[in-house]
Amino acid sequence: MNALAYLDLPHIRQARGLAALPGSKSISNRVLLIAALAEGRTEISGLLDSDDTRVMLAALRQLGVAVTDLGQGRVAVEGARRFPAEKAELFLGNAGTAFRPLTAALALMGGDYRLSGVPRMHERPIGDLVDALRAWGARIDYLGQAGYPPLHIGRGDIRADRVRVQGSVSSQFLTALLLAAPIEAGASGRPVTIEVIGELISKPYIEITLNLMARYGVNVVRDGWRAFTIEGDARYRSPGSIAVEGDASTASYLLALGVLGGGPVRVTGVGEQSIQGDTAFADTLAAMGANITKGSDWIEASGQAVAEGGRIKAFDADFNLIPDAAMTAATMALFADGPCRLRNIGSWRVKETDRIHAMHTELAKLGAKVESGPDWLSLTPPADSDWRDAHIGTWDDHRMAMCFSLAAFGPAAVRILDPGCVSKTFPDYFDVYAGLVSA
């Protein structure tokens, strides 16, 4: 798949079947870092095998952490509490879930580190996190444009027990500080409080972070979404083993197939017991008119097939809490019974690409009437006669490729450019897709 320049999708009419989800990217990289900083050995099962987890695994090994591949999505991590390597140059691709948390953790290590990534990573802002870490006493220098990677992290003088961070650009900045805080609290014996400035976006991702920290014995005292305190002497202790649940953001594409293609499509790996906020996308689908059923670790979706004249209900919704899954809603809007609007999606602009611009561009190619602003996008679906054949650019963004696979339910010919970009989170996506759909 990685070698293909493009993939022509056949026109599809139906989708049904069962699909096991790959491991959650958000959980996988958080667990890998926590396990590396914990006392004891952790066996991790269900780990996502993708570009983003590979760069995290490579970075941890460079930092001296012993990681053993046990096969079949299982690894063993020997916790080091502090990274043995005091000097390293790390290449972290376009993995925000690796770059941001490692920046915070390394800032507290007292070593000499350089962090870089692909060109797009060097366009993704990190200034709010760096400002917070500098105020904490860290020494961090920009190696290019101020406010953006690459970074040089040196030996700082961590003294403050209260840190403030902006919450309006990316919740990963708060996650990074939370994951790193036990390093300092455990070393100093003093509690560390992290204050959030402004409105915190993507709150469900913070819930994932707090849940995983608790599994490793660090319970965070909260003052709503404004302040988070890690007690003095806090330290991560391995639970011995931990299972990574399926990726709820990835589930959105497969569930959407079930809705648009009649279904049912059932995904396994997430369900009523999931800790991921993107499972709420099932409620979004229900509001569109889909039939949704759930179990402890599965979700099933069906609907009225659009190839038979079915249409989803038009929507005007705030997607602040589920920005990744919201991309699926944007392409589903091609099959709505009226104009649709996605609000509060400003975080799209600093993701793997400027997703508002990319979505606007590619949806318009198919014949939709699209408008967008700083944090919103609206779409009027094309009439059947207005659909246009399109070569869909994926903008080196895995989610663009997966979202636009849904366009094959329409009457136009769809070509996905650079389909291999799905390797960031779901290398086998188009194989799984082919197993669910039919003409």
Curated annotation (Swiss-Prot):
Phosphoenolpyruvate binds at residues 25, 96, 124, 172, 355, 399, 424. It is found in: Cytoplasm. Pathway: Metabolic intermediate biosynthesis; chorismate biosynthesis; chorismate from D-erythrose 4-phosphate and phosphoenolpyruvate: step 6/7. 3-phosphoshikimate binds at residues 25-26, 30, 170-172, 202, 324, 351. It catalyses: 3-phosphoshikimate + phosphoenolpyruvate = 5-O-(1-carboxyvinyl)-3-phosphoshikimate + phosphate. PROSITE patterns: EPSP_SYNTHASE_1, EPSP_SYNTHASE_2. Keywords: Amino-acid biosynthesis, Aromatic amino acid biosynthesis, Cytoplasm, Transferase. It is an enzyme of class 2 (transferase). Pfam families: EPSP_synthase. One of its GO terms (molecular function) is 3-phosphoshikimate 1-carboxyvinyltransferase activity. Its main location: cytoplasm. One of its GO terms (cellular component) is cytoplasm. Monomer. This is 3-phosphoshikimate 1-carboxyvinyltransferase. The lineage of its organism: Bacteria, Pseudomonadati, Pseudomonadota, Betaproteobacteria, Burkholderiales. The gene is aroA.
